[in-house]
Amino acid sequence: MDIHFEEGVLSPSATDMRPEPPNSLDLNGSHPRRIKLTAPNINLSLDQSEGSILSDDNLDSPDEIDINVDELDTPDEADSFEYPGHEDPMANRSSGQESESIPEYTAEEEREDNRLWRTVVIGEQEQRIDMKVIEPYRRVISHGGYYGDGLNAIIVFAACFLPDSSRADYHYVMENLFLYVISTLELMVAEDYMIVYLNGATPRRKMPGLGWMKKCYQMIDRRLRKNLKSFIIVHPSWFIRTILAVTRPFISSKFSSKIKYVSSLSELSGLIPMDCIHIPESIIKYDEEKSFKRSVRTSCLYNDPEMTSMEKDIDMKLKEKP
């Protein structure tokens, strides 16, 4: 089948007849305009006048709306189901009204809460103390009466009542106990005071760490540090002596001069009145054992023949001197 083309369609000169593409957009030219559609007027009144949505003109004929109600399938209770997350909020509100209500805070509960927690101000900061967790260790600090003239308080710190470091919540207990000791010290002290540190009968696992003792010293108010006249350590151990020797460069020379070591309760009674000082039974027993060992050691030295001969030689030399 032969296809005839018009002359010049496939000729090279036909390309010259093609329109050239535009080099720029014609911004000033005519553009097709958009056609605006106008919505018909609808009467939204509730009467059945002409044009109203309730007018009979919008209803179908009776033949078109003839529906047999008996033939309609209606869901029964078995077909009904609930969508999760789409419960009736009013029903939930009525059913959970009692569970969501806030119980009344009685006066007894308020007193109990005050017994469990104490709010104190230390270093211009408000702190809360868990009184329940430190209840077994509150005897660690006590008031030992007064000395001299005026209200010069004696504060007794019994290390034997400190918590055991093997506790799982040891750091939490020591943190609250630290706040309790500092706040109690501020309440007990009115003027000058001294601290009696009972170190005897305290195992190593109950000894406070260096960081805890340093923190206590730093958190004590400047007034309390200034009014502290003496820090007496009863039954000092090698460990407590080492701690004080290590911390000496970090504390003031004035505080170091206030530290005194006492080896027995009898020696302590010669320094301060003991009438109001409560000494734990474990420390009394510890002091008796140490006193007995000291007396035995002293008697052994006097009964030693070598010591007796040495004393005689010293006496002879002293007599020979003019």
Swiss-Prot record:
Residue ranges, annotated region (Disordered):
1-110
| Composition bias, Polar residues | 40-52
Q: Which CDD domains match?
A: SEC14 (cd00170)
Checking InterPro entries in the record gives:
Bcl2-/adenovirus-E1B, CRAL-TRIO_dom, CRAL-TRIO_dom_sf
Coarse class of the protein's main subcellular location? cytoplasm
One GO biological process from the UniProt record? apoptotic process
In terms of superkingdom, the source organism counts as: Eukaryota
Positions with biased composition (Acidic residues): 57-80
In what residue span(s) does the CRAL-TRIO domain sit? Answer: 130-291
**Entry keyword set:** Apoptosis, Cytoplasm
For this protein, the record's Gene3D superfamilies field holds: CRAL-TRIO lipid binding domain (3.40.525.10)
Q: Where in the cell is it found?
A: Cytoplasm
Q: PROSITE patterns of this UniProt entry?
A: CRAL_TRIO
Q: Which GO terms describe its cellular component?
A: cytoplasm; glutamatergic synapse; presynapse
Stored Pfam families: BNIP2, CRAL_TRIO_2
What does this chain do?
May play an important role in regulating differentiation, survival and aggressiveness of the tumor cells.
Q: PANTHER family, per this entry?
A: BNIP - RELATED, PROTEIN PRUNE HOMOLOG 2
What this protein is called in its record is Protein prune homolog 2
Q: Which organism is it from?
A: Rattus norvegicus (Rat)
Q: Which gene encodes it?
A: Prune2
